[in-house]
Each structure stands twice: as C-alpha cells, then as structure tokens.
Amino acid sequence: MKSVITTTISAADAAGRFPSSSDLESIQGNIQRAAARLEAAQKLSGNHEAVVKEAGDACFAKYSYLKNAGEAGDSPEKINKCYRDIDHYMRLINYSLVVGGTGPVDEWGIAGSREVYRALNLPGSAYIAAFTFTRDRLCVPRDMSSQAGVEFTSALDYVINSLC
C-alpha cells in the first residue's frame, strides 16, 4: 500500500541511496499531519452512515433521471448498489486517511472503476456529485478541526479528480 513513507523509502532504495533531507522533510510533514488525518478518519467512521446517505441522496437529487426505467437507479436494488458504492469509497477514503496516502483508493477503488461504470451504464458524474456534496457540506469546526477538514477534503478531491 502506497504512503508518503513507503513511496519515499522505495524511491531511495531503488536509487541505492539513503533518503535525502528533502525526503525526510516530506516524511516529517506527513507524520505531523497524521493527527489531523486520524481525527478526520475517526469523525468519518463515527458518522459514516449519515455521510453516505446524504451523499447518495444528493446524487439522486441532482440526477433524478437515474430512477427512470432503463437507467442506473431504476429499481430499489440498483439504488442500494449506488449507496453501497458510495459507502465503499468512503471506507477507502477512511483507510487512506489512516495510512496517510492514496494507496487504498488507488488499489481498491480507482483502478478500473471508470471502465466498470461505463460497462454497467453508471454515470461517473453521479458519484462525483455525491463526493462533491460531501466535500462542500463539511463545516469546520462543527464537523472536525480545520486541519482535519483539510485532510478530509483533500482525500475527497483526490477521489473526485480520479473519477473525472
């Protein structure tokens, strides 16, 4: 799983060198942000059901046609799968916050998702709308500290940009 630490160490090892001062500064910055990432992960874990429901509701509010016959959400089963997918991505975001890198999202979420969505006639824009709603809904300090909010929105932005 990729993180700033494992990526930095791997690059130094591949070059047959010790990590440079700038490598170590990057790792130190990552470690200093760890408390904020863990706070964001804890807040998401503690409230994930509401976050997923609100994100899914926002998706279907923006793209109400998805519930029409022949569309991606034309049955309760398909609608539940959309919420399940949003929950899956939120878990991956949580894991990424914990490890301090995008590895979980890259390895278990993004790889191949665009192709799967196209094959199943699922518009990626609907998922983007769900994650954008979650990002824009965040209220500091109501939901989490400002630094935790920065970490959470960065993780959401990574997913949003990866799905574009």
UniProtKB/Swiss-Prot annotation:
The keyword Amino-acid biosynthesis does not apply. (2R,3E)-phycoerythrobilin 1 binds at K81, C82, R84, H88. Heterododecamer of 6 alpha and 6 beta chains. The basic functional unit of phycobiliproteins is a ring-shaped hexamer formed from two back-to-back trimers contacting via the alpha chain subunits. The trimers are composed of alpha/beta subunit heterodimers arranged around a three-fold axis of symmetry. The phycoerythrins also contain a gamma subunit which is located in the center of the hexamer. Gene3D superfamilies: Phycocyanins. This is R-phycoerythrin alpha chain. Keywords: Antenna complex, Bile pigment, Chloroplast, Chromophore, Electron transport, Membrane, Photosynthesis, Phycobilisome, Plastid, Thylakoid, Transport. It is a peripheral membrane protein. Contains two covalently linked phycoerythrobilin chromophores. It comes from Griffithsia monilis (Red alga). The gene is cpeA. Belongs to the phycobiliprotein family. One of its GO terms (biological process) is photosynthesis. It is found in: Plastid, Chloroplast thylakoid membrane. Its main location: plastid. Light-harvesting photosynthetic tetrapyrrole chromophore-protein from the phycobiliprotein complex. The light-harvesting antenna system in red algae and cyanobacteria is formed of phycobilisomes. These are composed of the phycobiliproteins phycoerythrin (CPE), phycocyanin (CPC) and allophycocyanin (APC). Cyanobacteria also contain phycoerythrocyanin (PCC). The phycobiliproteins all share the same subunit composition and organization with variations in the covalently bound open-chain tetrapyrrole chromophores. GO terms for cellular component: chloroplast thylakoid membrane; phycobilisome. Pfam families: Phycobilisome (PF00502). CDD domains: PE_alpha (cd14769). (2R,3E)-phycoerythrobilin 2 binds at N47, R137, C139, R142. The keyword Thylakoid applies.
